[in-house]
């Protein structure tokens, strides 16, 4: 059993993009920014507990940070983890519905 405190730290924010919107409409998949050390099991448990929906599968990937310049200095943005969470048939979760 995963502690509730950990579940709250796993999910960071919804990732809103054209690709994420298309995935939601086409395959009932939500895209989230998650903690870099989060596992698929933790992500699944957190989504089910916090949003009260049934999760079918979780796919994850690590987005590499871009190299950026500020004048002569070269820096690098942090890497972050993205999760594609596919909900079971009939389940619905709408992040941007309140913005319309």
Curated annotation (Swiss-Prot):
Similarity comment: family membership: Belongs to the universal ribosomal protein uL23 family.
UniProt-listed InterPro entries: Nucleotide-bd_a/b_plait_sf (IPR012677), Ribosomal_uL23-like (IPR013025), Ribosomal_uL23/eL15/eS24_sf (IPR012678), Ribosomal_uL23_CS (IPR001014)
The keyword Glycoprotein is assigned to this record: no
UniProt GO MF annotations: rRNA binding; structural constituent of ribosome
Subunit organization: Part of the 50S ribosomal subunit. Contacts protein L29, and trigger factor when it is bound to the ribosome.
Gene3D superfamilies the UniProt entry points to: 3.30.70.330
UniProt xrefs under PANTHER family: 60S RIBOSOMAL PROTEIN L23A
Function: One of the early assembly proteins it binds 23S rRNA. One of the proteins that surrounds the polypeptide exit tunnel on the outside of the ribosome. Forms the main docking site for trigger factor binding to the ribosome.
GO BP field: translation
Protein name (Swiss-Prot/TrEMBL): Large ribosomal subunit protein uL23
Keyword Transcription regulation among record annotations: no
UniProtKB keywords: Ribonucleoprotein, Ribosomal protein, RNA-binding, rRNA-binding
Source species, domain of life: Bacteria
Pfam family, one: Ribosomal_L23
Family matches, as SUPFAM superfamilies: Ribosomal proteins S24e, L23 and L15e (SSF54189)
One Gene Ontology cellular component annotation held by this UniProt entry: ribonucleoprotein complex
């Amino acid at each position: 059993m995963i502690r509730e405190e950990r579940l709250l730290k796993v999910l960071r924010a919804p990732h809103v993009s054209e690709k994420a919107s298309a995935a939601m409409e086409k395959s009932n998949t939500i895209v989230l920014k998650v903690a870099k050390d989060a596992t698929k099991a933790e992500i699944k448990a957190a989504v089910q507990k916090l949003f009260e929906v049934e999760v079918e599968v979780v796919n994850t990937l690590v987005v590499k940070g871009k190299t950026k310049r500020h004048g002569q200095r070269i820096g690098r943005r942090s890497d972050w983890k993205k999760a594609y969470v596919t909900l079971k048939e009939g389940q619905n979760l709408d992040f941007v519905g309140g913005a319309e």
